[in-house]
Amino acid sequence: FVFPFEKYDQKILKEAKKRPIRHLMINTNGIKLAQDKDFVRQLAEFKPGLEIYLQFDSLDDDVLLQIRAAKLAEIHNRALENLNYYDISTTLVTTLVKNVNDHQIGDILEFAAKQSCVRGVTFQPLELAGRVSSFGLENRITLSEVRRKICEQSNLFTLQDIIPVPCNPDALAMGYG
């Protein structure tokens, strides 16, 4: 069960926990998690079975300004401090934009490996739809390029470790490290 963090309401989580829903995932940019440690404590009451899906496009504010039009590096760091403190399962979610943040894949993986709450990193290639207007086709990155860059920028994986998912091998791949 997934819902956007902006719509967060403890009643939703309480109702979901009463049902046969084993895993709750909250999508967030991390702002509230960074600003309100007590709020993170309240979220921790829903463990196990709660996961934070944290927008995490870069470690660099200059890059974040290009992608999100906001300086979010310190926000993300504070959010992760709070999530680490309460050991809330977290996935970092990186929208990859070719020639903007694709050179930081290795840095993001290394950073994630140092966070006790982080259970995974999801790299999502830029989708040219909706609000995306400042990027073009030259900023699209393919799954093959992502796999290659992971291996080039980090010693955590080899190409053999990152395997295409059979149900959609052109769009999905996974690796465990």
What positions do the PLM features span?
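Radical SAM enzyme [4Fe-4S]-AdoMet core and its adjacent flexible, acidic
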Residues: 85-177
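Radical SAM/AdoMet-radical enzyme domain recognition
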Residues: 6-125
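Glycine-rich phosphate-binding "P-loop"
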Residues: 1
